[in-house]
Amino acid sequence: MSDKNPQYSRILLKLSGEALAGGLGMGIDTSVLDKMSLAIAHLCGLGVQVGIVVGGGNLYRGSQLQKEGLVGRVTGDQMGMLATVMNGLAMRDALERRNINTRLMSALPIGEVTESYSSRNAIRYLKNGDVCIFVAGTGNPFFTTDTAACLRGIEIEAGVILKATKVDGVYDKDPSEHADAKKYDALTFDEVLEQKLGVMDLTAIALCREHNVPLQVFDMNKPNSLLNVIMGENEGTRVFH
């Protein structure tokens, strides 16, 4: 791959909380954080501009509390937004330990902890070579971090939205439960919507389709997978118009 150039100059990487938890199930697996920061630093070294949206499911899952009536949906979603801020802080410091200038930008104002999100500022930072981590989702309840990733990707004019998961692409059914699950190498947005494949939620998919921004789903735990995607190798599942 050394004779190849990156296929994208600017990307939006969606990291799920589940991916950050690694084998722990909950919390942050420091070895995973270290590997992710190294992979992202490698992209920066190639001149790729990197925006990141992080989830928060490794630190907080509100479904049970909401199911039992202990918190309302809005409160639960706000708690989830704060969980993404904690993950973002961890990722920022992991990248800065590798001498990567990193901006933590939040959809919710949080004083001295983050700076407020602005697409204009984010694009300026990216052009200067800084990594931008976008936290607190869209800042509104009822929207997933997948939707936030697509929204931020569109706003910063990313060439692709990359969804890093624990599975090496999109399947017709859960491969952990079905040995005969079929993996797709490529799909259209319409196929994802018609077949109700669990790539992202419908709002996120509709956003990407409307703005013609491709998606790629891949396994972040696989060695060199992120680099392979950037270099145009056959990795994971690509979703396009």
From Swiss-Prot:
Quaternary assembly: Homohexamer.
Pfam family, one: AA_kinase
Region ranges (Involved in allosteric activation by GTP): 22-27
Biological process annotations from GO: 'de novo' CTP biosynthetic process; UDP biosynthetic process
Pathway: Pyrimidine metabolism; CTP biosynthesis via de novo pathway; UDP from UMP (UMPK route): step 1/1
Protein name (database record): Uridylate kinase
Reactions that this protein is recorded to catalyse: UMP + ATP = UDP + ADP
CDD domains referenced in this protein's UniProt entry, alphabetically: AAK_UMPK-PyrH-Ec (cd04254)
Superkingdom as given in the UniProt entry: Bacteria
